[in-house]
Curated annotation (Swiss-Prot):
Family: Belongs to the RNase H family.
EC numbers, comma separated: 3.1.26.4
Keywords, sorted A to Z: Cytoplasm, Endonuclease, Hydrolase, Magnesium, Metal-binding, Nuclease
Protein name, UniProt field: Ribonuclease H
Catalytic activity: Endonucleolytic cleavage to 5'-phosphomonoester
GO biological process, one term: DNA replication, removal of RNA primer
Length: 161
């Protein structure tokens, strides 16, 4: 029987682009784990994606995962856009590579290991875990320690895949 894990995640960016961070809470029964990291130069959307990715990648086995986020970009991307992007070789209707391709490739790979239900909550409306994740993400953004290599180097810019 698969374990039920509840995940709450949020991203933050000071400047957008600017320094950013994510805060992710994983909860299994009475156990809770907090994941966070701060990046020197990144975007809010990248931090929203990174929080979910790092949470899922930290799971050691396939699980049922309930993910609560406040990012429409991530929720719509996963539930509505990703299948089309994959079919079109990760290109937009204008034949350009999608933004944040490195992260969409990672999330696309890791979601296949789990049974996921996505929940969206409105930001800054008092949802306890979302507010905690927001605070953790902002704190990490204020003290970055990691380079967002793919963003800073425009890695997928002008590349033919």
């Amino acid at each position: 029987m698969l374990k039920l894990v509840k995940m709450f995640s949020d991203g933050s960016c000071l400047g957008n682009p600017g320094s950013g961070g994510y805060g992710t809470i994983l909860r299994y029964k009475l156990h809770e784990k907090i994941l966070t990291s701060g990046f020197f130069l990144t975007t809010n959307n990248r931090m929203e994606l990174m929080g979910v990715i790092c949470g899922l990648e930290s799971l050691k086995e396939s699980c049922i995962v309930e993910i609560t986020i406040d990012s429409q970009y991530v929720k719509q991307g996963i539930t509505n856009w990703i299948a089309t992007w994959e079919k079109k070789k990760w290109k937009t209707t204008k034949k350009k590579l999608i933004k944040n391709l490195d992260l969409w490739l990672r999330i696309n790979a890791v979601i296949k290991n789990h049974h996921i239900t996505w929940f969206w909550v409105k930001a800054h409306m008092g949802h306890l875990e979302n507010e905690r994740c927001d605070k953790i993400a902002r704190q990490s953004a204020q003290s970055p320690s990691v380079k967002d290599f793919f963003y800073e180097n425009n890695f997928y810019q002008n590349k033919n895949l």
